[in-house]
Amino acid sequence: MPVLHNRISNDALKAKMLAESEPRTTISFYKYFHIADPKATRDALYQLFTALDVFGRVYLAHEGINAQISVPASNVETFRAQLYAFDPALEGLRLNIALDDDGKSFWVLRMKVRDRIVADGIDDPHFDASNVGEYLQAAEVNAMLDDPDALFIDMRNHYEYEVGHFENALEIPADTFREQLPKAVEMMQAHKDKKIVMYCTGGIRCEKASAWMKHNGFNKVWHIEGGIIEYARKAREQGLPVRFIGKNFVFDERMGERISDEIIAHCHQCGAPCDSHTNCKNDGCHLLFIQCPVCAEKYKGCCSEICCEESALPPEEQRRRRAGRENGNKIFNKSRGRLNTTLGIPDPTE
């Protein structure tokens, strides 16, 4: 029976990926469709992806598939053809190609079965996730941005919004998608006469959010097809103004794609203009925060003097100090301080 999970250490896999000479292409895609047996589907896809040397993060559930992956450039078209042939529901599926890609986004393949491909917290049996808002293409997005009756709602987390967003887009203050959904409904109650335009990184969150808004009585709901990634790509291809400002946060080693030259965020340590996220180098912290090059040198990649001092201790002493601490890494939130998460790079679908 073939091995259906990775058995090589992360360090070895990362070193192997960094030594590769062939360029890689970072791709994201999702599809809401019924999967009768997610476990069997997962195992079959794992073999397909492994044969094509695909790395990345893939989630499957009865409601569909959500993937962020890295594919050797020479295998991209073969991957596309085999994915389309895998299930009729996937034929012609839109693949979002990364905008700002060094090919070093992933170095291991992780494929998991979950209850949902997006953790939404919705338990309403009458909710119809297929009753989504209308798609908007790049030119239509720009027209909506100039429409005084349209409100753009950013369905990403606060640390994503902080480094980049559409002009005048509303932030729904939250640390997870499941927190955002009820807040979006609450915040928009007085604006049911407005045109609601929802967006996210690649489309998966705003598509479900648009259905949730319609379920809660909002009738004028749109969402951007393919999210920020596809919007920026199509706008550039069509010679349209790109109205997204700043950087598009992404959930892989790159931590961001440059969309415009503007830097709208600031270093969390000194306040200098900066939009580069990093994780604190102290293994007992791993705070996700924004750090400028000057502070990175001053604090040796750490978020504070305390972490800087601790990271310089002998490994055994560091382990002793970490013993008994709350597990999980953290996210910097300017209004709420440090927040727990379970990954160094947070998962947008949690």
Curated annotation (Swiss-Prot):
Biological process GO annotation list?
Answer: tRNA modification
Tell me the SMART domains matching this sequence. Answer: RHOD (SM00450)
Offer one Pfam family short name for this entry. Answer: Rhodanese
Gene3D superfamilies tied to this protein: 3.30.70.100, Rhodanese-like domain
EC number(s): the record gives 1.14.-.-
Which residue positions are annotated as catalytic? Answer: C200
Q: Which UniProt keywords apply?
A: Oxidoreductase, tRNA processing
The enzyme's first-digit EC class, named in words, is oxidoreductase
Q: Name one GO molecular function term.
A: oxidoreductase activity, acting on paired donors, with incorporation or reduction of molecular oxygen
List, for all copies, the residue spans of the domain called Rhodanese.
Answer: 146-240
This protein's record includes keyword Oxidoreductase = yes
What reaction(s) does this enzyme catalyze?
uridine(34) in tRNA + AH2 + O2 = 5-hydroxyuridine(34) in tRNA + A + H2O
- Database matches in InterPro entries: Rhodanese-like_dom (IPR001763), Rhodanese-like_dom_sf (IPR036873), Rhodanese_C (IPR022111), TrhO (IPR020936), TRHO_N (IPR040503)
What family, per the record? Belongs to the TrhO family.
Q: What does this protein do?
A: Catalyzes oxygen-dependent 5-hydroxyuridine (ho5U) modification at position 34 in tRNAs, the first step in 5-carboxymethoxyuridine (cmo5U) biosynthesis. May be part of an alternate pathway, which is able to bypass cmo5U biogenesis in a subset of tRNAs under aerobic conditions.
**What is the protein name stated in its UniProt record?**
tRNA uridine(34) hydroxylase
Q: Which organism is it from?
A: Escherichia coli O17:K52:H18 (strain UMN026 / ExPEC)
